[in-house]
Amino acid sequence: MSGAGAIAAASVGCLRTGVPRPFSAYGRGLIIRCHSTGMTLDNINRAAVDQIIRVDHAGEYGANRIYAGQMAVLGRTSVGPVIQKMWDQEKNHLKKFNELMVAFRVRPTVLMPLWNVAGFALGAGTALLGKEGAMACTVAVEESIAHHYNNQIRMLMEEDAEKYEELLQVIKQFRDEELEHHDTGLEHDAELAPAYTLLKRLIQAGCSAAIYLSERF
C-alpha cells in the first residue's frame, strides 16, 4: 500500500470507530492521527467542512492544471524552473486535499472535467503572452485563492477555533504559500503583461465564478 493509501486507510478506520482524528499539515506529508479530542464526523459542521474541502480540492486541482499549461509553453525557458517550483508546491496541496477527501468522505465537484480543460487553457493561453502573461495569471489566481482561504479561516475561527485547529493550520500554511507565489509573480514582471489590469480582473472574475460553482456542485 502506498503512503497516501495507508494514511487514508488509517483515517477512515478512525472515522468508522468514532475516534476523533485531527490532521496535521507539518512537513511534506499530511499526518492524520487518532486522538481523544478534535474533529470527528459526528462533531463537525458537515455541510461547512464538506464545502471547504470540496472547493479547496477543486481550486488546487485547477491551479495544478494552470501550471501544467504554463510549463507546456514556457517549461524550456529561463522562467521554467520558477514555474516548476510553484507547481511542485501546488502538487503537494492537491495531494493533501485528496487525502482529506477520503478521510472526510467528501465527493469532488462534478465540474472537475471543466476545471481540467479550463485550467490548462488559462495557463497555456496566458503563457503564450510571454513570461509576463504567465506571471500576471499567477498573481491574479493566487491573490484570489489567498482571499478565499482567508474567508475560510475567519469562518472556522468564529465557529470553533479549537475544534478546527489543525484544519486551520492546513489552510493557513497553504494561504501563506499562495501569497509567496503571488509575490513571485510580481517579482517576475507580472505587471508588465499586456493589459495587465484588465487581464487580472478577468481572471479573478473567472476564479470567483469557479469558487461559487465548486462550493455548490
From Swiss-Prot:
Its EC number is 1.14.13.253. NADH binds at residues 212, 216. GO terms for molecular function: 3-demethoxyubiquinol 3-hydroxylase activity; 3-demethoxyubiquinone 3-hydroxylase (NADH) activity; metal ion binding. PANTHER family: 5-DEMETHOXYUBIQUINONE HYDROXYLASE, MITOCHONDRIAL, COENZYME Q10 BIOSYNTHESIS PROTEIN 7. It is an enzyme of class 1 (oxidoreductase). Component of a multi-subunit COQ enzyme complex. Interacts with COQ8B and COQ6. Interacts with COQ9. It catalyses: a 5-methoxy-2-methyl-3-(all-trans-polyprenyl)benzoquinone + NADH + O2 = a 3-demethylubiquinone + NAD(+) + H2O. It holds the Pfam family COQ7. Keywords: Iron, Membrane, Metal-binding, Mitochondrion, Mitochondrion inner membrane, Monooxygenase, NAD, Oxidoreductase, Repeat, Ubiquinone biosynthesis. Signal peptide: none annotated. Its main location: mitochondrion. It is a peripheral membrane protein. This is NADPH-dependent 3-demethoxyubiquinone 3-hydroxylase, mitochondrial. Catalyzes the hydroxylation of the 5-methoxy-2-methyl-3-(all-trans-polyprenyl)benzoquinone at the C6 position and participates in the biosynthesis of ubiquinone. Catalyzes the reaction through a substrate-mediated reduction pathway, whereby NADH shuttles electrons to 5-methoxy-2-methyl-3-(all-trans-decaprenyl)benzoquinone, which then transfers the electrons to the two Fe(3+) centers. Pathway: Cofactor biosynthesis; ubiquinone biosynthesis. Its cofactor is Fe cation. Binds 2 iron ions per subunit. It is found in: Mitochondrion inner membrane. Belongs to the COQ7 family. Fe cation 1 binds at residues 60, 90, 93, 178. GO terms for cellular component: extrinsic component of mitochondrial inner membrane; mitochondrial inner membrane; nucleus; ubiquinone biosynthesis complex. Sequence repeats lie at residues 48-129, 130-217.
